[in-house]
Amino acid sequence: MAVKIRLKRMGAKKSPFYRIVVADSRSPRDGRFIETIGTYNPLTEPAEIKINEELALKWLQNGAKPSDTVRNLLSKQGILEKFHNLKYGK
């Protein structure tokens, strides 16, 4: 099972709000998911990003691949750097 960390769109029409979820890559964008690890609200100024760091690191270590947008959000929060240091032992 190929697992991805990606955005699940929530909210009303023209006012999107996203949940950052871990899901099987074959399931639909807003469909079935395994676990929610955070939220992202692009409408606030600045954009509000809340990510559970422990869960994100756990899933990255288990081989989950983040989507491009989630990769950018994780690096803004410093989580990808911590994952890199854990993986390569710095």
Swiss-Prot record:
Q: What's one Pfam family here?
A: Ribosomal_S16
Keyword Ribonucleoprotein (UniProt)? yes
Instruction: Supply one GO BP term.
Output: translation
Q: Per its record, how is this protein called by name?
A: Small ribosomal subunit protein bS16
- Organism (species): Anoxybacillus flavithermus (strain DSM 21510 / WK1)
According to its record, what are the GO cellular component terms? cytoplasm; small ribosomal subunit
Q: Which Gene3D superfamilies match?
A: 3.30.1320.10
> Looking at the keywords, is Ribonucleoprotein present?
yes
Family named by the database record: Belongs to the bacterial ribosomal protein bS16 family.
The alphabetized UniProt keywords are:
Ribonucleoprotein, Ribosomal protein
The record, for PANTHER family, names: 30S RIBOSOMAL PROTEIN S16, SMALL RIBOSOMAL SUBUNIT PROTEIN BS16M
Q: SUPFAM superfamilies this protein is in?
A: Ribosomal protein S16
| PROSITE patterns (alphabetical) | RIBOSOMAL_S16
**What are the GO MF terms of this UniProt record?**
structural constituent of ribosome
